[in-house]
Amino acid sequence: MRVEVVRAPGPLNRPALAEAIDTLGKKSATVRPSSATHRATAQTLSHEITSTDLFATSTATEQQQTLLLAINDDDGAVMGFLKTGVKHLFYLNPRGEYTEIDPICVLDFYVDEVWQRRGVGLQLFQRLLQEENTTPAQLAYDRPSPKLFAFLKKHVGLTEYFPQPNRFVVFDAYFQSRE
């Protein structure tokens, strides 16, 4: 497996790659029952938030969006993606005070079901940390799914956060790492 990094409004002019990204973006937002557990396996979104059209917008450029793609070495198939961008957030602390922050945010993270639980997501996440020269605690997470919470707990030990009205999760360790 290799990881390709594309920065907005980067070149997604390879038709097969663009089609694969659009397909995975739709899968990422769709709720399907898992045959093994009979529970929802995606993010319960009303529409996809990752597509080649959205990646080509001025908003994607303004947010410095990056798309990390896990590519199968054997057949070139896109196995998963991780989309990030910088967002200006108002963080509400437990005392009711707001702080303005501009973290790199995990905006969408999806590995195709056939490739899940094989280390693909972990490799994407580690490559993100390497590319951005950051730590998991220094990131914000846009509406993380239960699967992403479990992933972060298992692989990097992030669990403590104060719920935000904007549904972004900024872990308490974000502020501890800046002290």
From Swiss-Prot:
All copies of domain N-acetyltransferase, residue ranges: 1-175
Domain of life assignment: Eukaryota
Key words, A-Z: Acyltransferase, Transferase
Gene Ontology CC annotations of this record: microtubule
Residues that, per the record, bind acetyl-CoA: 109-122, 145-154
GO biological process, one term: regulation of microtubule cytoskeleton organization
Function: Specifically acetylates 'Lys-40' in alpha-tubulin on the lumenal side of microtubules. Promotes microtubule destabilization and accelerates microtubule dynamics; this activity may be independent of acetylation activity. Acetylates alpha-tubulin with a slow enzymatic rate, due to a catalytic site that is not optimized for acetyl transfer. Enters the microtubule through each end and diffuses quickly throughout the lumen of microtubules.
Pfam family, one: Acetyltransf_16
InterPro entries documented for this protein: Acyl_CoA_acyltransferase, Atat, GNAT_ATAT
Gene Ontology MF term list: tubulin N-acetyltransferase activity
PANTHER family to which the protein is assigned, alphabetical: ALPHA-TUBULIN N-ACETYLTRANSFERASE 1
Lineage of the species this protein comes from: Eukaryota, Sar, Stramenopiles, Oomycota, Peronosporales
CDD domains: NAT_SF
HAMAP family registered for this protein in UniProt: mec17 (MF_03130)
EC assignment: 2.3.1.108
Family from the record: Belongs to the acetyltransferase ATAT1 family.
Catalysed reactions, as listed in the record: L-lysyl-[alpha-tubulin] + acetyl-CoA = N(6)-acetyl-L-lysyl-[alpha-tubulin] + CoA + H(+)
Entry protein name: Alpha-tubulin N-acetyltransferase
